[in-house]
Curated annotation (Swiss-Prot):
UniProt-recorded name of the protein: Large ribosomal subunit protein uL22
PROSITE patterns (UniProt xref): RIBOSOMAL_L22
Domain of life of the native organism: Bacteria
Keyword RNA-binding: yes
Entry-linked Gene3D superfamilies: Ribosomal protein L22/L17
Keywords: Ribonucleoprotein, Ribosomal protein, RNA-binding, rRNA-binding
Job of this protein: This protein binds specifically to 23S rRNA; its binding is stimulated by other ribosomal proteins, e.g. L4, L17, and L20. It is important during the early stages of 50S assembly. It makes multiple contacts with different domains of the 23S rRNA in the assembled 50S subunit and ribosome.
GO cellular component: cytosolic large ribosomal subunit
Organism, as annotated: Sinorhizobium medicae (strain WSM419) (Ensifer medicae)
Biological process annotations from GO: translation
Keyword Flavoprotein: no
An MF annotation (GO) of this entry: rRNA binding
Record-stated family: Belongs to the universal ribosomal protein uL22 family.
Length: 129
C-alpha cells in the first residue's frame, strides 16, 4: 500500500549500520543516541562504554558495526570518523495484558524501536594539502 520508500543514498565518505526491532522504547533509545551525535567515534565508544543505560550496549554494537562497514566496505580512515547521524524510529508495539484485582485486566504495551547510525569521514584541520 502506498508508494515504496526511496532508498537513502550515502555519500562517498559515509557508512551506516542499522539495528532493527530493538526491545526498548524509542524515547529511551533516543536519550542514548543523543549522547553520541556529532562526536568522534572513539569518544562516542567511550561514552557508551561507561553509560549506565541498559540499551547502551546495543547502541555500542551498532556503532562498531558502522565503523567496520566504513573500514571494510567503503575504505574510510577509522581515525577520522565522526557520528554524523544517529536517529531512532518506531517499530511494532506488542500488546499484553496484566491481570488486576476483581477480575479486571489492564493493557501493557511493549514497544520496539529501530536505530540507524551514519558515520562520516572528515579531514583533519591541521593537515597541509
Amino acid at each position: 500500500m502506498g508508494k515504496a520508500k526511496a532508498e537513502r543514498r550515502l555519500k562517498d565518505n559515509e557508512a551506516q549500520a542499522v539495528a532493527r526491532t530493538i526491545r526498548v522504547s524509542p524515547q529511551k533509545l533516543n536519550l542514548v543516541a543523543a549522547l553520541i551525535r556529532g562526536k568522534k567515534v572513539d569518544r562516542a565508544l567511550a561514552e557508551l562504554e561507561f553509560s549506565r543505560k541498559r540499551i547502551a550496549g546495543t547502541v555500542r554494537k551498532t556503532l562498531e558495526s558502522a565503523i567496520a562497514n566504513a573500514e571494510n566496505n567503503h575504505d574510510l580512515d577509522v581515525d577520522s570518523l565522526i557520528v554524523a547521524e544517529a536517529f531512532v524510529g518506531k517499530s511494532i508495539v506488542m500488546k499484553r495484558f496484566h491481570a488486576r484485582g476483581r477480575g479486571r485486566a489492564s493493557r501493557v504495551e511493549k514497544p520496539f524501536a529501530h536505530l540507524t547510525i551514519v558515520v562520516r569521514e572528515v579531514e583533519a584541520k591541521g593537515e597541509a594539502a
